[in-house]
């Protein structure tokens, strides 16, 4: 394969979409300001939106770096290891690719919520207390897990450049799911596709909304794998532990620092691995039991004091 010509073929649809994103963010902000005057509500904060735009700009650069690294790896896999090559010039191959890319997005997204080292990268996207088109641009600066979950695609025969194109369109679709200005859509759409209603649930920190609705374009994966949740009420948009900062570097890397601190104080290797690869919030059994005993003792003390 001619790597130079391959590189020239790799176009990122996001590069063309970004100017339209900015225009749509401005339009939505004006609409929500008008709602604020009528209802006393607003979906935008100037400093919050500025933070999201800074994070989105940085994410584009880091995505370019990931593309440079993975392009050559994927080209080698596709050229030397793929048992067959899927033609890129047919309509059915693109439909198949879009479905497969969306499925890999689902598993990568689920990994990013259920494995702490993955959550350390992804949590920045969930750090806003607002939910709007600007929030869609609040992207992570370390998209390493995508490269891992994409690796099977060139092995399955998809040309590397087509993977980047399909992923770009996947992200463009998801941009429009970050809004409160659109209610529920007709049921056939809600059943098949990831809609603003479904994605509002995903961004909620309410107990019933946690770790739900991972789909990118299609919501059928969540229905198939048991992670679907209907929107029941307006979600609480934030991390379960609010970050209280707009510093983009803290938002991007704070959880890595928390992991390092937990690993350093852990006495056993098993506990250290748990702090890295277990779900966010995991603690060793001895700490959970100690906290439970402390809670029970506090409750007993309150009962005694009231007698």
Question: Which ranges hold each PLM region?
Answer:
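Loop-to-helix transition at the N-terminal end of transmembrane alpha-helices
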Residues: 12, 16, 42-57
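Short, strongly hydrophobic alpha-helical membrane anchors
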Residues: 1-11
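Membrane-embedded catalytic scaffold of the fatty acid hydroxylase/desaturase
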Residues: 57-66, 88-237
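Cytosolic-facing loops and C-terminal tails of multi-pass membrane proteins
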Residues: 234-307
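Membrane-interface helix-loop junction between the first two transmembrane segments
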Residues: 25-50
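Central hydrophobic cores of alpha-helical transmembrane segments in multi-pass inner-membrane proteins
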Residues: 20-32, 98-103
């Amino acid at each position: 394969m001619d790597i130079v010509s391959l590189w020239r073929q790799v176009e990122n649809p996001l590069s063309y979409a970004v100017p339209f994103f900015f225009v749509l963010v401005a339009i939505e902000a004006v609409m929500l300001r008008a709602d604020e005057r009528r209802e006393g509500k607003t979906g935008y904060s100037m400093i919050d939106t500025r933070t999201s735009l800074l994070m989105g700009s940085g994410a584009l650069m880091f995505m370019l770096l990931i593309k440079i690294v993975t392009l050559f790896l994927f080209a080698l896999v596709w050229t030397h290891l793929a048992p067959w090559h899927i033609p890129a010039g047919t309509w059915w191959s693109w439909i198949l690719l879009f479905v497969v890319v969306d499925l890999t997005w689902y598993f990568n997204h689920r990994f990013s919520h259920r494995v702490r080292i993955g959550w350390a990268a992804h949590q920045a996207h969930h750090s806003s207390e607002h939910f709007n088109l600007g929030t869609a641009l609040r992207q992570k600066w370390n998209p390493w897990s995508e490269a891992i979950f994409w690796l099977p695609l060139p092995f399955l025969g998809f040309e590397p450049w087509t993977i980047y194109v399909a992923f770009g369109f996947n992200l463009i679709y998801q941009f429009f799911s970050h809004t409160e200005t659109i209610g529920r859509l007709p049921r056939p759409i809600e059943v098949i596709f990831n809609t603003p209603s479904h994605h509002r649930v995903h961004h909620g920190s309410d107990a019933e909304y946690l770790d739900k609705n991972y789909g990118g374009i299609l919501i059928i994966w969540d229905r198939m794998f048991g992670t679907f949740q209907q929107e029941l009420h307006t979600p609480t948009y934030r991390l379960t532990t609010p970050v209280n900062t707009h510093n983009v570097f803290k938002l991007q890397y704070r959880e890595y620092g928390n992991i390092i601190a937990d690993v350093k104080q852990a006495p056993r290797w098993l506990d250290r691995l748990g702090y890295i690869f277990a779900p966010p919030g995991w603690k060793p059994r001895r700490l959970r039991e100690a906290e439970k005993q402390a809670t029970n003792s506090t409750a007993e003390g309150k009962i005694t004091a009231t007698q």
